[in-house]
Amino acid sequence: MELQQDIGFVFHEKWFDDWDSLIANSRHYGKYYKNYDETLLKEYLKRFRLDGKKKYKKLSKGEKLKFAFAFALAHHPKLLLLDEPGANFDQTFREEFHHILREFTADGTKSVILSTHITSDVDRFADYLLLLKKGRQLLYGDIESVRDAYRMVAGCFLYTSPSPRDYAASR
């Protein structure tokens, strides 16, 4: 139980009460954390433009993740475990999210483990990269070594429709 005190979790699974407000939810679940700081939670709610009086059920997916992120930060964890948090954030908030993660880890005493499919998230603030496929490790290393050894390739599928000549020949 002591270890749990030092970990902030943000997952897509719902674990807050639908019919309670954000503040009521945070008070209820905050009592399980000895370092829970309601003042800090309210600062993050304001920063994330979330109304603490709003019912959890009325939030969008992105707002629910913002609230979970605020709650995770509000008990002063040493480690944040984040499962695809940016998937439902708009680009503007994603920038704020990255800024907060940099603030969180700035003093070198705290860490973030982030699961993501958004490779730009990794490139912006990761120190280490672990690449998994079906639960098996494909790659692990510090980000600079990975950059030196591998190249990220991005592209798009170019659809070309048949030319009129091809269309005529097939009739």
Can you say where each PLM-predicted feature lies in the sequence?
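ABC ATPase "signature
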Residues: Y140-G141
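Conserved catalytic loops of ABC-family nucleotide-binding domains
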Residues: I100-L114
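Helix N-cap at the start of a conserved alpha-helix in ABC-type nucleotide-binding domains
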Residues: Q91-F93
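Catalytic Walker B motif of ABC-type/P-loop ATPase nucleotide-binding domains
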Residues: L80-E84
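Single conserved hydrophobic/aromatic residue that forms the stacking wall/gate
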Residues: Y159-S170
